[in-house]
Swiss-Prot record:
GO biological process: L-arginine biosynthetic process
The organism's place on the tree of life at top rank: Bacteria
UniProt KW keywords: Amino-acid biosynthesis, Arginine biosynthesis, Cytoplasm, NADP, Oxidoreductase
Record's protein name: N-acetyl-gamma-glutamyl-phosphate reductase
An MF annotation (GO) of this entry: NAD binding
InterPro entries xref list: AGPR_AS (IPR023013), AGPR_type-1 (IPR000706), NAD(P)-bd_dom_sf (IPR036291), NAGSA_dehydrogenase (IPR050085), Semialdehyde_DH_NAD-bd (IPR000534)
Cellular component, GO, one term: cytoplasm
Purpose: Catalyzes the NADPH-dependent reduction of N-acetyl-5-glutamyl phosphate to yield N-acetyl-L-glutamate 5-semialdehyde.
Gene: argC
Annotated SMART domains: Semialdhyde_dh (SM00859)
Broad class of where this protein is predominantly found: cytoplasm
Residue positions of the active site: 149
UniProt EC number: 1.2.1.38
């Protein structure tokens, strides 16, 4: 059995890792950590785990964690991850980091959007963990930068168009909507029930959302040239899910049927990407609790613009499920192991 630690297990991505790995036939979760809830069974923090996972949360130094396990998942906020990841790496442990700390290749860019990087020497070692595009690199990696939730939905939604040079890379506009779990479990006034319920609002407007450099980095690699996008996130009064509506201008005349065929060929054999038939569009309700990314494509006949809509569960394909998918690849296991999760509907 592969022994794993979940560092930062008292957040939403942490408990989602526990939920998924509990059914993984090759994994034993042997260490879960939390500063605030140390000494308590994890099931007392998350009653949904009662009777199935009662492991006690610990507050350990990185060395103590590394001594117990083979692989470490760091489900920590940015900066907190880069304070502990170097120790795990020095002790020979594979690390899958769910924070933003190792996603951006350039330390100066990271510093502009976040803060000065504490260990920029590790950035070249980190592999951006989007399996559909980096499968071979992930299999050889010892440090995975697990992608963000919005970036996952946008990158998977645009990859075939950019690789196929079907669209003008300068024309990309993204409107993306997320459930409230994307903001984490910490208490914030903006996430209170009365602030969110019966409302729908934009935030991070005007090119200031921190996922923008991550998205642009990966889309630029796909396009073969640097590009900028217009990205506007929105908050939806639901627990989980992301729906991204992506607009772009094609380089020539295109038909929806041809674009769907392009996507089907690009994602042929991918276990977690579902390209929908013409006239069928994704819904977050149909991916909830699963590792799927559903993609629908159409063309605005009046303006000629291509419209791609992608739907994911922000806590699964947008975080913990993709992390387990990466772990499977790193360990030489079947990629879908532990991830055969049917969406929860209704």
């Amino acid at each position: 059995m592969i022994k794993v630690a979940i560092v930062g297990a008292s957040g939403y991505t942490g408990v989602e890792l526990i939920r998924i790995l509990h059914s993984h036939p090759e994994v034993a979760v042997t260490c879960v950590t939390s500063e605030q809830s140390a000494g308590r069974p994890v099931s007392s923090v998350f009653p949904s785990l009662r009777g199935r996972c009662d492991i006690v949360l610990e507050n350990l130094e990185p060395v103590g964690i590394a001594e117990k396990v083979d692989i470490v998942f760091t489900a920590l906020p940015h900066k907190a991850a880069m304070e502990v990841v170097p120790t795990f790496m020095k002790m020979g442990k594979d690390v899958i980091d769910l924070s933003a700390d190792y996603r951006i290749h350039d330390a100066d860019t990271y510093g502009k959007w976040y803060e000065p990087h504490l260990n920029p020497e590790l950035l070249p070692e980190a592999v951006y963990g989007i399996p559909e595009l980096r499968r071979a690199e992930i299999a050889e990696a010892s440090l995975i930068a697990n992608p963000g939730c919005y970036p996952t939905s946008v990158i998977l939604g645009l990859a075939p168009l950019l690789k196929g040079k079907v669209i003008d890379p300068r024309s990309i506009i993204v409107d993306a909507a997320s459930g409230t779990s994307g903001a984490g479990r910490g208490a914030k006034v903006d996430n209170l029930y009365c602030e969110v319920n019966e409302g729908f609002r934009a935030y991070g407007v005007g090119g200031v959302h921190r996922h923008i450099p991550e998205i642009e980095q990966e889309l630029s690699l796909l396009a073969g040239n640097p590009l900028n996008i217009t990205f506007t996130p929105h908050l939806v009064p639901m627990d989980r899910g992301i729906l991204s509506t992506i607009y772009s201008q094609p380089t020539g005349s295109v038909k929806a049927a041809d674009l769907i065929a392009l996507y089907q060929a690009f994602y042929d054999g991918e276990p977690f990407v579902r390209v929908l038939p013409e006239g069928v569009l994704p819904s977050t309700a149909h991916v909830r609790g699963s590792n799927f990314c559903d993609i629908g494509i159409t063309v605005d006949q009046r303006t000629g613009r291509v419209i791609v809509i992608s739907a994911i569960d922000n806590l699964v394909k947008g975080a913990s499920g993709q992390a387990v998918q990466n772990m499977n690849l790193m360990c030489g296991l079947p990629e879908t192991l532990g991830l055969d999760l049917l969406p929860v509907f209704p």
